[in-house]
Amino acid sequence: MLGVLFFNERRHYMTNEQIKASLAPCGLSCEKCFAHVDGDIRRYSLKLKEKLGNFDIYAKRYETLLGDPVFKKYPDFKEMLDYFASENCKGCRNEQCKMFKNCGVRGCHQEKQIDYCYECDEFPCNRTNFDENLYKAWVRINEIIKNEGIEKYYERTLNRPRYI
């Protein structure tokens, strides 16, 4: 079904193909990942960098003027913000996952020619190379997608943070 389903969080209509493009074959949301080039975290980080301008200079002054040592930590904050704002990943369907270098899902899904892991006869398997926590989440997510359908899963998780 390629019809219009509903608005996403950016108020754009989403089709099944667009939903598939936003989710990795494992079921995790690439768009919500901090490393995604078109993700909210990168977009908000770029905006915050723009709004902060040359705050480096002021952070040093505020440390003295306000007597608050928290401003000593601004360089660390800025380093993290710069990292979040950098172009990093185009999503697991477009390139090898940059978050999990040993991820076995992309190669497997291409080999098996499936959209999501739950569609595989061998699901769940040990080809993912995920740690225990991610493996459990992967199984749970794919079981939900299998039982509820991708549209319902996407809609249900649309406004939920990626990192919960």
Language model regions located:
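Short, Lys/Arg-enriched N-terminal segments with co-localized hydrophobic residues
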Residues: 1-13
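Cysteine-centered metal-binding/redox modules
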Residues: 13-164
